[in-house]
Design a protein with these regions (language model features):
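Conserved beta-loop-beta element that borders a ligand/cofactor-binding pocket
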Residues: 91, 132-157
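Rossmann-fold cofactor-recognition segment
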Residues: 33-46, 66-68
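Substrate-positioning beta->alpha
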Residues: 159-168, 180-205, 211-212, 226-229
């Protein structure tokens, strides 16, 4: 599991280990091994580290939570496809263009936008779509593309584009938090990271998942203002007063 110490990765690693699988996890930090889990310290952005890792081991499954530039991914996706039975690429539901109903077949921004200035960038939604295309055009089919959206977990809380370190930490330190109110009226989905991890685990070794794409997102939606109210209610209960 590449970069498997985040919100989704932490849950997925535990699920796989509890199922009796031997799991290697890359991390930038030195972490203690646990039952069926071996942590390997290294920088996956360093392709020499990746080559060394794959030269020493053959993995039945590679699950990739890393965020690459398109140039970086172009240099390594063949390494992954050629050194595993099934490669999981974590994309994002942000690749989609606006639509009333979004499915895996819905148009992506990359496919429909005519904004040349935007297309000249490697913005997150574009780079993920381009990297999906590299896999699809590879003439290989031993990959599975996962498109989650906003997730939350014991180590991740989000509010629009803000992470907990930006707003909750400030509040707990006694400071006011600046919240972009224009975002608060927007609707989102928030999926528990463990639910995403459970779905990914069920796709491992599934031949029908090869070469396919899966949105793993809750069907329930919520306004960011309501999410903010939930956070404020919990903080008020903890702190004894309602934060600003």
């Amino acid at each position: 599991v590449l970069g498997g110490t985040g919100a989704m990765g932490t849950h997925l690693v535990s699920i796989l280990a509890e199922a009796g699988m031997k799991v290697d996890v890359t991390s930038r930090q030195e972490l203690a091994d646990r039952t069926n889990i071996h942590y390997i310290k290294g920088n996956v952005h360093n392709i020499s580290f990746v080559k060394s890792l794959l030269a020493q081991n053959y993995y039945n499954v590679i699950i990739d939570f890393m965020i690459y530039t398109t140039v970086e991914f172009n240099d390594r996706y063949w390494l992954y496809l050629n050194n595993t039975d099934q490669y999981f690429y974590l994309s994002t539901s942000r690749v989609y263009a606006d639509a009333a109903l979004i499915t895996e077949e819905s148009p992506r921004l990359l496919d429909v936008t005519t904004d040349k200035k935007y297309l000249a960038t490697d913005e997150y939604a574009l780079c993920k779509a381009r990297q999906e295309d590299l896999l699809r055009n590879s003439c290989k089919s031993n990959f599975t593309i996962i498109r989650p959206y906003k997730t939350y977990s014991e180590i991740r809380l989000q509010l629009g584009a803000l992470d907990k370190e930006t707003f909750i930490q400030r509040i707990l330190q006694g400071h006011s938090a600046v919240i972009p109110m224009d975002v608060m009226s927007h609707t989102t989905t928030l999926t528990y990271a463990r639910d995403v991890a459970i779905c990914i685990a069920k796709l491992i070794g599934n031949k029908k998942a090869m070469g396919d794409t899966f949105n793993i997102v809750t069907s329930k939606n919520i306004k960011w203002m309501d999410v903010l109210d939930i956070y404020l209610n919990v903080l008020e209960n903890k702190m004894g007063y309602r934060p600003n």
